[in-house]
Amino acid sequence: IHPKNFKENFYQNKKKRKILLTIDDGLLSFYENAWPILKEKKIPFILFVSTREVGSFNYMNWEQILELHESGLVEIGNHSHSHEYLVDENPKIIKNDILRSIKIFNEKLGKNSIFFSYPFGEYSLEFKKIIKELGFDYAFGQHSGVIDETKDLWELPRFPINEKYGELKRFKTLIKTLPFKYEKITPEDRYLLQSNNPPNVKIFFKDNINYLKQINCFSNEDNKWRKSNISFVEENILEIKISEKFIGERGRINCSLREKEGFWRWLGIQFVIAEK
């Protein structure tokens, strides 16, 4: 779908599967290799750029970005100014960084984008609050999953496709995934301190998900992927028991459920682990 049609596709009852293509960082290799193909095929997408990096080594410059911007195919999305680990910073530093990027967007493109992509896909409740206050309508993480009308507008999932996870076979699997519809996931803050690591995770699913009790979840607790210990504490409330702390920068949980005709429901959760 074209980014300009994202809102109507988000709220409509989607009977047909649709894809929104997003590209992070604005690397020169994308401009040289992928852009000519996407332009020829008239495939729309969002290109998220960090304003500090524009024009530096191996990154696109503003002239190239303007070319995409004026093509009618591309939305230039905001990816912060510095692309640092902002989630670990205090709110003032986060806000000033994003304000700087907005200023440059207005100077170079005549407007800021309504789309934001969190650097490294990392966010907290505080970071989300800042993004909402600064006027962004949508924000994307890097946790895997399918967008539907139950998803939080400021923590939208995406399936990463890169040099590590870019095989055509995987892509064909991804386009046969379906959403898990849910009311909420707790804890709501995806930023974990040492005091609440590991978290007590609960997913409050919407009604009428077929075969929900057959769901499987996996987590990378203790830096080792393993099948999670799960149980339904109520009919549609799943508890995921994480026995070991998440180690490193991120903790991940992926849940899946096989549907008919080779389709899968998929839901990913990403936690950011505080430095201290």
Please place each PLM-identified region on the residue numbering.
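Terminal accessory/targeting
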Residues: I1-L20, S29-E63, P160-K276
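Metal-dependent polysaccharide deacetylase catalytic core of the NodB/CE4 family, i.e.
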Residues: I1, K15-I19, L27-F127, D137, ...
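Acidic, His- and aromatic-enriched active-site or binding-groove loops in soluble protein domains
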Residues: F136-G145
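Generic alpha-helical secondary structure signal
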Residues: F10, E122-S124, S144
